[in-house]
Amino acid sequence: MIRRGSTLERSLLLKFMQRTYQDLFPNEDFSHLEQTVKQYFSSDTPLWWVEEEGEQGDKGTRGQGDKGNNYTQFPIPNSQFPIACLWVGNAIDQVQGNRHAHIFILYVVPEHRRRGIGTALMRYVENWAIQRGDRQIGLQVFQSNKPALNLYNQLGYQTQSLWMVKFLSAEK
């Protein structure tokens, strides 16, 4: 079941963010992500969780979009803890000037991946964005994250720009 998160779930969001980055960069310290959550997480940046529904073995059906309720169902395994997270913010298209959804984080716990949960969450947020009048959705993904790149490509996402970084040394 997809459940709309609350701004009271800041610490759980932080745990999921840290897991996201630790999966990709296991030797790094991500304590600074607390500041990111503190700065950007609000009622204007919705959060959704994927959780079990009902008794063990009970499964829902696939669904899409908010449509005024807080729950959407689709088959997922039993779990005591959320098994996936989707956090969305707002951005302005710098070419056209239109507001649009921007995905901050999509994370599925490793043992629940490749079961359609990420795809279902992406379709869910696409429908949510359409309902609020958005014409596009943006996100950033690390080039080294091949599974995520494959998912986004399969869903029709295209590269619009490249984020380029140059590491600077304090020594000369």
Regions found by a protein language model. Give the residues of each.
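Acetyl-CoA-dependent GNAT
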Residues: 1-55, 68-105, 109, 122, ...
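Active-site acidic-Proline motif in GNAT/NAT acetyltransferases
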Residues: 109-111, 115, 143-144
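Conserved acetyl-CoA pyrophosphate-binding loop and the N-cap/start of the following alpha-helix
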Residues: 112, 116-124
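Conserved active-site alpha-helix within GNAT-family acetyltransferase domains
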Residues: 119, 143-161, 166-168
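Conserved GNAT acetyl-CoA-binding A-motif
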Residues: 122, 130-140
